[in-house]
Amino acid sequence: MKVAVLGAAGGIGQALALLLKLQLPAGTNLALYDIAPVTPGVAVDVSHIPTAVKVVGYAGEDPTPALEGANLVLISAGVARKPGMDRSDLFNINAGIVRNLIEKVATVCPTACVGIITNPVNTTVAIAAEVLKKAGVYDKRKLFGVTSLDVLRSETFVAELKGKDVNDVKVPVIGGHSGVTILPLLSQAFEEDKIDFTAEEVAALTKRIQNAGTEVVEAKAGGGSATLSMAQAAARFARSVLKGLTGEQVVEYAYVEGNGEYARFFAQPVRLGLNGVEELLPIGTLSAYEEEAVQAMIPTLKADIELGEKFVNG
């Protein structure tokens, strides 16, 4: 198996390279690519860590060598949020970066699974889909927006609030990957049993989870965005996809093109397998609060998606 990270010299990319070197199955090849000249050095640096994962780094304008033979491509290239910016402010820069990289994926490794980390994910995934479609190689089972950080944050915050063991807490998160489109289904949160919340706790937790990215941006005071936690979420996602590609049945949350019930792309539980998404899993019964929140987010989510489609198609 080969995993390629595009944007490997950035804040997320370097942390992700480290985690993948430590966590990928023995025998996996890891290719690191970035436009920055430091990238081969990042590869040399992590290659000194004693695990059976082979790492090679590539720099420059052309990601082709990194993409050749890739089974999974993770794209974290782009600019990070600064204080006062929201994820949509990133669109103007990151949209073009994602488009250009996906054009290369379409020619070099069209059957690879692709995980988009670059924000705004609600929009960049739509861009990727349209570029792949134009190239005649789009397989909706193999394109993902990596939203697993929303799940990790939800589980962490719930465990902290309720004094639970975070390893046992499970919280589904659906919708999208920014602001009001992030919806933790706290009515379905459980440890060994269902976890109960007051209405006030639900409102406060939901808001904190939705604004957790901003919490990090502000705490870093202009020095970056959520890179380390995002890298861990992406590494977990990568391991899940690879398990699926080797025949294991794995459930993960991701932003995928589904049945269009709410919007063309929607974050939900999926069963991963040999072809990427093998099955879209039901989101279960929503509370009245959650149902209202889903209906309220749909216009935002649809507008985000349309922005990406129009960027490619005019």
From Swiss-Prot:
This is Malate dehydrogenase. NAD(+) binds at G7, A8, A9, G10, G11, I12, G13, D34, N94, I117, T118, N119, M230. Homodimer. HAMAP family: Malate_dehydrog_1 (MF_01516). Substrate binds at R81, R87, N119, R153. One of its GO terms (biological process) is carboxylic acid metabolic process. One of its GO terms (cellular component) is cytoplasm. Its EC number is 1.1.1.37. The active site is at H177. Keywords: NAD, Oxidoreductase, Tricarboxylic acid cycle. Catalyzes the reversible oxidation of malate to oxaloacetate. InterPro entries: L-lactate/malate_DH, Lactate/malate_DH_C, Lactate/malate_DH_N, Lactate_DH/Glyco_Ohase_4_C, Malate_DH_type1, Malate_DH_type1_bac, NAD(P)-bd_dom_sf. The keyword NAD applies. Belongs to the LDH/MDH superfamily. MDH type 1 family. It catalyses: (S)-malate + NAD(+) = oxaloacetate + NADH + H(+). It comes from Glaesserella parasuis serovar 5 (strain SH0165). The keyword Oxidoreductase applies. GO terms for molecular function: L-malate dehydrogenase (NAD+) activity. It comes from the Bacteria.
